[in-house]
Amino acid sequence: MTLRAVGVRLLGGLLLFALLAAGAAPLGWDLPESRSRASKIRVHPRGNLWATGHFMGKKSLEPPSPSLLGTAPHTSLRDQTPQLSHHLLRVLLQKQALGMSLSVPAPNTQHRRLLVQTLQK
């Protein structure tokens, strides 16, 4: 074979390869949208707010029931007076049984008084 025949065959092979590659290319490539179509999308500066309220939970105008909160209903100080008196008497009897003085305050009472004053402000 002459040099010219080899060149023609090589050129023919390259052309055939290019045609096959060009024919298969649109099937295998996932090309992005053209720039003209992509530029038409509006961008909102505050972002997409479609699900803002969806994740915020149920809104209710009524206060939650005590059974749902796991706490007892609100009771006044007058309702609690007998229980508090009973508890105070029990603490005083325990202090007396342990030999502690009832007139001397406990060491942390000063801190407790400061905390109570701060909370009342």
Curated annotation (Swiss-Prot):
GO terms for molecular function: neuromedin B receptor binding; neuropeptide hormone activity. It comes from Bos taurus. It is found in: Secreted; Cell projection, Neuron projection. The modification Methionine amide is found at M56. One of its GO terms (biological process) is sensory perception of itch. Residues 61-80 are annotated as: Disordered. Pfam families: Bombesin. Residues 60-121 form a propeptide. This is Neuromedin-B. Keywords: Amidation, Cell projection, Cleavage on pair of basic residues, Immunity, Innate immunity, Secreted, Signal.
